[in-house]
Regions:
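Glycine-rich dinucleotide-binding loop and its adjacent helix/turn
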Residues: 48, 125-183, 187, 215-216, ...
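Beta1/beta-strand and adjacent pyrophosphate-binding region of the FAD-binding site
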Residues: 1-12, 157-167
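A Rossmann-like FAD-binding core segment of flavoenzymes
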Residues: 93-96, 100-111, 118, 181-278
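Rossmann-like dinucleotide-binding cores of NAD(P)H-dependent redox enzymes
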Residues: 40, 73-80, 152-153, 158-162, ...
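Flexible, glycine-rich terminal cap/loop adjacent to redox cofactors
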Residues: 9-37, 42, 49, 53, ...
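FAD-site-proximal beta/loop scaffold in flavoenzymes
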Residues: 140-157, 240-317
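Beta1-alpha1 glycine-rich phosphate/pyrophosphate-binding loop at the start
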Residues: 6, 11-77, 176-196, 401
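N-terminal Rossmann-like dinucleotide/flavin-binding domain of flavoprotein oxidoreductases
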Residues: 2-4, 35, 42-117, 197-220, ...
Length: 441
């Protein structure tokens, strides 16, 4: 049995950053990842990096096969870099294998050449999330059905792509494949498109997708999936639909299966997410959980912040917690991207605040004209009494950069007038925040 001060299960953003930090302070660390193809974590290998690389090339009407080759090169470079960032440290052992708990201090690791047992003073779980597959007849047995990981491995572009689920993952793939030239159909079971966004924002997104040729079918109750003449057939009460490939984009769930958490006294919620407190401590006193596996917001930057919280608890004053996050922005990398921080208009009004709303069409922004992309709208919700920004939605080119400016102002508890009167360079998309907040009176 090998003894470590820290055992880290999962090579994700929080896990790999914590491993390097602890090792550099003298801890003996082992990080366990069940597949060498996942060194570096979900984001680098099957998430943010490969998808955004393809989005970038699709926006430039690049060749699909060439884009796929570039995607592989980008991923391989970053995976190798991440591996050596840890493996080259003297007191870090990178172990390929599947881990399960024997007790709250001991792991059994199954490797290609046998088993080994590791013991750790402290253990950190960073196993991420996995695709949630709905119970639809034939969905898991029909050729041509993929989750996002499988679709990212295609060598040839499908002429027709069906997407099961109209959420944020589905949006990115729909926009990307449409830009590559694929006929895309989104099958959304709900009666409303993007219910987490304001209706006007959701409608603007729908129009942009439809202009790309994307078909959006709401109330699409897919009852069965099967193979039909070399294609994938989706059966609904309204009739059958044929596609060449089907993406299952119905969400992701915490990856806790097989960890044998009960042996360590680690509790999970009804969705399998590991229950943690504000400091990411589990129900076992020497075990922490970080990132998507807790069932919270599934963003790489949240996983990174989880690392900061755990680091502060181990090496600092222990005051940092999840309560310090304030306003968490997000971006959906469709074309153009959607970015939001804070409340929607509907949420703000429901809170009882007296609000004023400003909207600005992207067509009114000079930089958008320069970049020849005038699609979308900017929207701000402000509390009239406090002059504080309650929320902002940006559907426009470069919104993924702009939203971080808004978050900074909101976190600093500054009035909206800071953005209204801020000096920005010209011509830029950021200066449109001047115009947007000038509409608040």
């Amino acid at each position: 049995m090998t003894q470590y001060q820290a055992l880290i299960i999962g090579f994700g953003k929080a896990g790999k950053t914590l491993a390097a930090t602890l090792a550099k302070t003298g801890w003996r660390v082992a990080i366990i990842e069940q597949s060498a193809s996942m060194f570096g974590g979900t984001c680098i290998n099957i998430g943010c990096i490969p998808t955004k690389t393809l989005v970038h090339d699709a926006e430039r009407e690049g060749d699909f096969s060439v884009a796929m080759q570039r995607k592989v090169a980008v991923v391989n470079f970053l995976r190798d870099k991440n591996f050596h960032n840890l493996a080259d440290l003297d007191n870090v052992d990178v172990i390929e294998g599947r881990a399960e708990f024997i007790d709250n201090h001991t792991l059994r690791v199954f490797q290609a050449d046998g088993e080994r047992v590791l013991r750790g003073e402290k253990i950190f779980i960073n196993t991420g999330a996995e695709s949630a597959i709905p119970a639809i007849t034939g969905l898991t047995t029909t050729a041509g059905v993929f989750d996002s990981t499988g679709l990212l491995s295609l060598s040839q572009r499908p002429a027709r792509l069906g997407i099961l689920g109209g959420g944020y993952i589905g949006l990115e793939f729909a926009s990307m494949f449409a830009n590559f030239g694929t006929k895309v159909t989104i099958f959304e079971a709900a009666p409303q498109f993007l219910p987490r966004e304001d209706w006007d924002i959701a409608q603007a997104i729908a129009r942009i997708l439809q202009e790309k040729g994307v078909e959006l079918i709401l109330n699409a109750s897919v009852q069965a999936v099967s193979s039909q003449e070399g294609a994938v057939q989706l059966e609904t009460p309204e009739g059958a639909h044929l596609v060449d490939a089907l993406l299952v984009a119905s969400g992701r769930k915490p990856a806790t299966t097989g960890l044998q958490l009960q042996n360590a006294g680690v509790a999970v919620n009804e969705r399998g997410g590991i229950i943690v407190d504000d400091y990411l401590r589990t129900t076992a006193e020497n075990i922490w959980a970080m990132g998507d596996v807790t069932g919270g917001l599934q963003f790489t930057y949240i996983s990174l912040d989880d690392f900061r919280i755990v680091r502060d608890g181990l090496l600092g004053d222990g005051k940092r917690s999840t309560r310090d996050r304030q306003n968490v922005p997000y971006s959906v990398f469709m074309t153009p991207p959607l970015s939001r921080v804070g409340l929607t208009e509907e949420q703000a009004r429901a809170s009882g605040a007296t609000v004023q709303v400003a909207t600005l069409p992207v067509a009114a922004i000079p930089r958008a004209r320069v970049m020849d992309d005038t699609r979308g709208v900017l929207k701000a919700v402000v509390d009239v009494n406090t002059q504080r920004i309650l929320g902002v939605s940006l559907l426009c080119v470069d919104s993924h950069e702009m939203i971080n400016i808004v978050k900074t102002v909101m976190d600093a508890d500054l009035p909206y007038t800071v953005l209204r009167d801020q000096i920005f360079t010209h011509p830029t998309m950021s200066e449109s925040l001047n115009d947007l907040f000038s509409l608040i009176k």
